[in-house]
Amino acid sequence: MHLMYIPMSPKEQRRGLCLLIMMLATVLIFPLRPSVSAEFGFWAICFAGTIFIFRRFLTASAQIPLTPVSIVLKFSLLGYILAFLANLLTNDLLFYFLPRHFYYNETGPHFFNICKEQLAGFASENFLLAAGFTVLFVPVVEELLYRGLIFGSLVRKNLPLAYLVSTIVYSAVLTLPVWSGASMDYIALHFVQYLPVNLMFCWIYVRTETILTPILAHIIMNALCILTLR
């Protein structure tokens, strides 16, 4: 598949992979940060490292507009809407087809999205700090690493493989907080929840050929999410 988007340099790819590995190691050791300040600090460091490592890629993406701004804005909004609808459909299908014990036990509902629950706790502690890392740091870091680095490095060679690998890695990393002490069915439910988001954001990256589109879509998604916790 021939894409005209700005590629990452080999040096950026190597350094980005090292950053991703260090982030994963940190999350494995400390799956749940104890406070909103600690979470903000973690994402601030990741954000600074990501911007530094991918500064050439980001500068080139901003200075060489291969896609009109109107198209970027349109697909950013479309990507968010499609990801939201796909997530709703996925959850409805799981709820309909899976046995009741996947969602309920003797005391009532027992399945919840741990990332959203943790974010709600952070927002109640300090809303501005929670909004800062959720709306700015997280979208930039995750899109550059999962869509820009992993998906972008594979998409020119094999598009289906790029979708598959980036989706598995993205969903697996976001389920890390529930790996410890959780049952496999509980982990699987969390894993599946993140599939639609990755697929939609990869799709708008391919359609617009700029990493700025999924970054903006991710910002929109997280901004609306944090506003519901206000």
Question: What do these predicted ranges mean?
Answer:
Residues 61-138:
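Juxtamembrane helix-loop-helix connectors linking adjacent transmembrane helices
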Residues 125-230:
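Transmembrane helix-loop-helix hairpins at the membrane interface
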